[in-house]
Amino acid sequence: MKPTDNNSYRHILKYMGIFGGVQGLNILMSIVRNKVVAVLLGTGGMGLISLFNTTVRLVSDSTNLGLSMSAVRELSAAYEQGDEERLKHRIQIIRMWVALTAIAGMLLCILLSPLLNRFTFSWGNHTLHFIALSPTIAFLALAAGETAILKATRQLRQLALQSVYGVLGALLTSIPLFYVWREAAIVPVIVLAAAIQWVLVIIFSLRRYPLKFSFKQTRLSEGYGMVRLGVAFVASGILASAADFIIRSYLSHAGDIQIVGLYNAGFMVTMTYGGMVFHAMETDFFPRLSGVKNLGGEFNKIVNRQIEASTMVISPLLVAMTVGLPILLPLLFSHAFLPVIDMMRGSILAMYLRAMTLPMEYIALSRGDSRHYLLQEAVAALLLVVAVIAGFHFGGLTATGYALTVASFLEFLFVLVYTYYIYGYRLSRHALLRFVFQFSLGLITLAAVLTLEGWLYWVAGALLLVVSIPHKVSLKFFHFK
């Protein structure tokens, strides 16, 4: 296969490396920020940040009309055809709709602030906090719209720089505020971080596509098709945010704010940090898959190659994370978060399954089948909520970690069967073999860290890490070229 083939392994790994590297750099800066915040605010402060952020995401996802995804599809068609005038026209339409959603989201947050306070917290009155957080909704919507423009027009360098600068800006501004005002700085820091992200993305976006605003009914009506497609993204975002909201509210009531902080730390490290290699899918894999007109052999090949590449890249990271948690967790946060290690070890296995499931979930998106995609997300959200509640009820945070893996396995089976019957997708033998091999290593690693101590712990971990790293023999065996 030619190196210029956008669906080749070389291309997939290249962009997974680029955006995974950017995410890694962002995470490195976030480590410093989280470490300082954990020391200054403790588990209670981390839990409070988690509750505010989760609620903000819920309101944001409920009001942005899914434009961050549907706009990419809308603009990509004009960009690929080289029609500059049509592209600029569509950008104006998207910016009008984004501005409307930003205003609506901010006002809705203000109006619903008493209800948000009631359902989020079991103590105190945080209504004014939610009112103060309302500009965050507008900043997030505006930033998402401009980011969609950069993605659709393949401004990869600008996307990477904006991401890095945004995290750096949040780091440099939040630490002094937390140091001086402690928990009182939480709301201002959240608003300021969103504002910094918005300012940075418009700097890059407006350089290439200057702002030309004109609110006309005819132009707004041209965006109805894009909005209809985005409704499914909104619904899926609401489901995901609602699931997070329900989980953290349940933990807040069934446990306490410290439990929420511990769960958030464990979930963040395993699902967010561990999933940094998946970042390229939205930017690179989704547009490529959308460009394939017909289902069949070539379509299946693209999905299977993405699964193989994702499994290959993430597996060594997961082994290293499983082994290194006793060092990694205090480094990321503080020793007060060590009780969540067993939960994290159980949930890391879910990331292997995520590497299989996520590329298949993009199939429905690439076909524009909003109902099928929404059904997949509904099942995933339901499984997540049931798993966390059941796990915490029967075995505390530790059981919650293993319950997350069980939920991910059930989600994988559902998506695999569903995409087969709807789209004729077939998981290749090579992709399945690679997954079985790496998942088995993950199970062996888990058994090793639970049973071994001292130097045997580290020697076994190092050997398993070496085995998980792809090399010439394994690549040849799996026909990975």
Residue locations for each model-derived region?
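Membrane-proximal transmembrane or re-entrant/amphipathic helices at the cytosolic face
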Residues: 2-6, 446-481
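Membrane-water interface segments that mark the loop-to-transmembrane alpha-helix transition
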Residues: 14-26, 52, 61-114, 128, ...
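Transmembrane helical elements of multi-pass membrane transporters/channels
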Residues: 14-34, 46, 166, 190-197, ...
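Alpha-helical transmembrane segments of multi-pass membrane transport and lipid-handling proteins
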Residues: 92-121, 171-172, 179, 277, ...
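Interhelical loop/hinge segments that connect adjacent transmembrane helices in multipass membrane
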Residues: 1-12, 201-244, 284-301, 422-436, ...
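Membrane-interface junctions at transmembrane-helix termini in multi-pass inner-membrane proteins
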Residues: 138-162, 348-379, 419-422
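Hydrophobic alpha-helical transmembrane segments
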Residues: 127, 131, 160-208, 225-228, ...
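Helix-loop junctions and terminal segments of transmembrane helices
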Residues: 65-81, 152, 266, 270-307, ...
